[in-house]
Amino acid sequence: MSARNTNSRKDVIVVGAGPVGLSAALALRSCGLEVTVLEADPANRVRPGSRALFVHRESLALLDRASPGLAPAIAGFGVMWRTKRTLLGGREVYARTYPELPPGRIPPFTSLRQLDTERFLLEAAKVAGADFVWGARVTAVEAGPDEVLLTTEDGATHRACYVVAADGSRSTVRRSLGIAMNGPRSEGFHTTVDIAEDPDDPMPLERTFHYEHPGLGWRHVMRVPFAGGFQIDVQSADGDRPEEFATEEAVRDWLPRVVPRKYVDSVTCVANYRFLQVVAESFADDSRRVLLAGEAAHLFPPLGARGMNSGIADADAAANAIALALSAADPRQAGAAVERFDATRRAAAEANRDAAGTALAHLRPRRRITRLRQRAAAALSPVVPAFGEWLEQATYGPKTPRPHAGRY
């Protein structure tokens, strides 16, 4: 390795203090390992928008295992809507209301802004003893047979036995290692609008998906509640331009067609994005010292809320693999632990990508017959409820639990 090493070697360095990096830090500390988190942003960073909303039950269970009490804290802050409703062309085709959960049980999910999830994770990681270096943007990575050397923008170097790369979709770590991302980019774009709820006169706590909304030119529109507000997601039509939907002026024009006009003055964030369906060709480097997690390893449509939840599963699996590697009797066993992580989590990511891609193909059909089937299902749903349920479930993609990798 380079002679530029200036710091004592750590067990593990996590690059990135988003939800995946923080989850990795928690899991590593629960394994008894020292961990330092390098984050490019300053400690007082402000994160725009709601970003990832849903923390699912399996993720809550993983977090609670690493930090007992964390699951009820996050779930208690977030909201769980009990009613989901699906419409097509202005007519309801499916609705279901779930019973109240028994006290003390982890909910199927909780909905809150990513910045709120991160706040809980950061506090738990600090209490657990993770060290943080803020304003430490990684610019170079050297991985060798015995350690990894990271160089940050200020010229400082950091050495570790293992590194978890959780530095997001533009991962410097992944790019430095030459690991490619493979997969397609979807057509069109989506516009999301975060809105603060009116505490005196709130909308029903329901998730609604509206195929072909008549008030918005027959575009698909979804409303998802989160703690303190809700998000509107609009799917673009062919020929749409982002400036027609994702500017302040545009939102003020179209938003009253889908929610009461009073919410025009309660918009907190507007964004537009395109869907990628890509997975890293490997979740570990050739030396088996760097493990990729979260968006550093995969990007796919958020249909089914697979993004952050799969990243939390990556983080937990990476921590377990590193703990096994550090306690291994010889380098071959250590490498095998990382290889198992690579194979298992890459297979999970590919399954998630395919499931989200199936949902996206349903929502953006290339063949007219698919749209006709959806409309026929809507017409028949009053007499055959299964058709309405199909329209509801298809927006998430298939649920295919993997016995060795969990749901995500």
Identify the residue ranges that each predicted region occupies.
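Glycine-rich FAD pyrophosphate-binding loop
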Residues: 29-51
